[in-house]
From Swiss-Prot:
Pfam families: ATP-synt_B. This is ATP synthase subunit b. Keywords: ATP synthesis, Cell membrane, CF(0), Hydrogen ion transport, Ion transport, Membrane, Transmembrane, Transmembrane helix, Transport. It is a single-pass membrane protein. The lineage of its organism: Bacteria, Bacillati, Actinomycetota, Actinomycetes, Micrococcales. F(1)F(0) ATP synthase produces ATP from ADP in the presence of a proton or sodium gradient. F-type ATPases consist of two structural domains, F(1) containing the extramembraneous catalytic core and F(0) containing the membrane proton channel, linked together by a central stalk and a peripheral stalk. During catalysis, ATP synthesis in the catalytic domain of F(1) is coupled via a rotary mechanism of the central stalk subunits to proton translocation. Component of the F(0) channel, it forms part of the peripheral stalk, linking F(1) to F(0). PANTHER family: ATP SYNTHASE SUBUNIT B, ATP SYNTHASE SUBUNIT B', CHLOROPLASTIC.
């Protein structure tokens, strides 16, 4: 009996188990009522923050993509506008060059026309001068050959004019014969 009276050290006393169980239930109640909701709230806040961060990151990424697309569109628009400006400048340059060429051609034609007029005027002046000189020389020569004085100007002019008319007629016949 001695062995029966002695309690097994591995089996606890019933009252100890009961008090320990009640303490455990109270601690469990306090943990479930106050501690677990606090942890749940912290976990929920952290999850919301992470999800919000992900949403913000997605929004920022979408915004960055939209900004990049807008930038690319503006860049393409700027390229097209630059190309248009280059084409307009090239066209304007060609117009200016054509205008300068037209002006140069007109100026060249004007200078050529003036030169022809000047040459024609000089030729006419030379013809008149040569006629006068030829007339004077012919008169002097004729008066020496004929022995008749041609000092009368009207008479000398008639002789010279007749001589030059005969000369022109002879040139016309030789020119037509050629």
């Amino acid at each position: 009996m001695l062995a029966a009276e002695e309690a097994n050290p591995l089996i606890p006393d019933v009252w100890e188990m009961l008090i320990t169980g009640i303490g455990f239930v109270i601690l469990l109640f306090i943990a479930i009522k106050y501690i677990v909701p606090a942890f749940e709230k912290v976990f929920k806040d952290r999850a919301d923050a992470i999800e919000g961060g992900l949403a913000k990151a997605k929004a920022a990424q979408a915004e960055a993509k939209a900004a990049r697309d807008e930038y690319n569109q503006q860049l393409e628009s700027a390229r097209l506008e630059a190309q248009k400006i280059r084409e307009e400048a090239r066209s304007e340059g060609e117009k200016i060059l054509a205008d300068f060429k037209d002006r140069a051609n007109m100026e060249s034609a004007r200078i050529t026309e003036n030169a022809h007029k000047a040459i024609e005027a000089e030729r006419a002046a030379a013809v008149v001068s040569l006629r006068d000189e030829v007339g004077t020389l012919a008169t002097q020569l004729a008066s020496k050959i004929v022995g008749e004085s041609l000092n009368d100007d009207d008479r000398a002019n008639r002789v010279v004019d007749r001589f030059l008319a005969d000369l022109d007629a002879e040139q016309g016949r030789t020119g037509a014969a050629r």
